[in-house]
Amino acid sequence: MTDANDTPATPPRESLIEYPSDFPIKVMGKMQDDFAETIVQLVQQFDPEFHTGRMEMRPSSGGNYLGLTVIVRATSREQLDALYRALTAHPMVKVVL
């Protein structure tokens, strides 16, 4: 398949990420005592070696929200897709980037 410029189209499942690799994911939610712990437990289901040393926390300026950056060891696109689905489906999570 080619596009209008006669260059090959990128296959839809082709990834720009080389696996395995460290991959940052930003997760935001309401400021709650167990938010970070809950996210750590969820991420560990997909990356068993994940620990709090691979996470940064930033409260919002108003103190109502907490932003987390988790660095996961990505082993496949399927793993990342499943992790994103689990994070976005969690009731404590407002945004995943």
UniProtKB/Swiss-Prot annotation:
It comes from the Bacteria. Belongs to the UPF0250 family. This is UPF0250 protein RSc0326.
